[in-house]
Swiss-Prot record:
InterPro entries: TIR_dom, Toll_tir_struct_dom_sf. SMART domains: TIR. Pfam families: TIR_2 (PF13676). This is Uncharacterized protein y4lF. It comes from the Bacteria. The keyword Repeat does not apply. The keyword ATP-binding does not apply. One of its GO terms (biological process) is signal transduction. Signal peptide: none annotated. Residues 1-142 form the TIR domain. Keywords: Plasmid. It comes from Sinorhizobium fredii (strain NBRC 101917 / NGR234).
Amino acid sequence: MPSVFFSYSHADEGLRDQLEKQLSMLKRQGVIETWHDRRIGAGEDIHRAIDDHINTDDIILLLVSADFIASDYCYDIEMQRAMERHHSGEAIVIPIILRACDWHHAPFGKLNAVPRDGKPITQWPDIDEAFLQVAKAVREAAGRVTRTASAPPARAAAAATPAASPAPQSLGPRSSNLRLAKSFTQRDKDQFRHDTFEYIARFFENSLKELGERNAGFEGVFRRVDANRFFATIYRDGKDVSRGTAYLGGETWGRGINYVHGETTSSNSSNESLNVEADDQTLFLTSMGMASFGRDRDQKLSQEGAAELLWAILIAPLQGTRY
C-alpha cells in the first residue's frame, strides 16, 4: 500500500486536518496509508522518525504556504530531501498550495501543483471542492505507485542512502485518525466576521479599480462610509448601472454581513446575508441564499468565496446586458 508523508508548517495544522479528512475514503479503501509528525509517540526521536518517513514514503505532500517556505526545517530539510527522491524516481512529490505565497521560484515550482492552476486552497469559494481535487490527485499518484510496485521498492533504495538516519524502533501499529474536535468561542467568530468584512471591502475596492482599467467607458467607485459599511458603484459613460451597499450587523439581520442593492445607510433590509458558522475543525461562512434562490445555502464559503458571491450580485446587471 503506498505511504503518504505530510510535509507542513504547524501554522497550517488546521488545513492539514481538513485535507486528511478528505483522504479518508482512500484510507478506508486501502489505497494509501498516511503519516505526519503528530503520530510520533512519546519517547521517540523526532528527527529520526521524520527521517525514516521522508526517506521511505512513496508520496510526499508539500503543504505550501508562506509559513512552510519560511520554516528552515520544512524547506531546507524535508523539501530538499523530497525533491532529491522525486528526481531519482524514488517518490512522487505533490505541491499543495494552501495559501497565497511566492512558490513558483522554489525547487518544486515546476511541478504540477494542486488544486487546479495552483490556486491556493484558502481562495476557493468552496474549500471542500479544493480539497477534493487534492484527494483525486493523491489517488492518481497512488495508482502510479501501485502499477510500478514490481520495481525495486523505494524503502530499499533509501536504506542504502548514506544520508538516511536509522529507523526508530516501532512502538506498534497506530491509527492516523488522532484529530480532535476544535471549539470556537464567540470571540473567535466575531473576529472572523470582522476580518471577513475587511477582506470583502478590499476585494470590492480592488475589483472595482480593475474593472475600470480593463473595460473602456466603465468606472468603478468604492466609498468607505464607516468601519461597518461601504458603497460600491459601477458607471458606464458616467451613468450608474449598478450600485450596492455592504454592511455589518443590522436591526433585522443580527450579526451577519449583509448586502443590499443601491446605496443606503439603513440596516433593516438585505438582498443577501452571510453568517459565520463552525464545524469541528474550522470557521467558515454560509449564505442565506436569497440572491440565488437557495442554491448557495449549503456551501461552506471561504472569505474569498463570500466576497465573490457578493461581487456577483453587483456585477450581474452588466453581465446580463450586451453593451
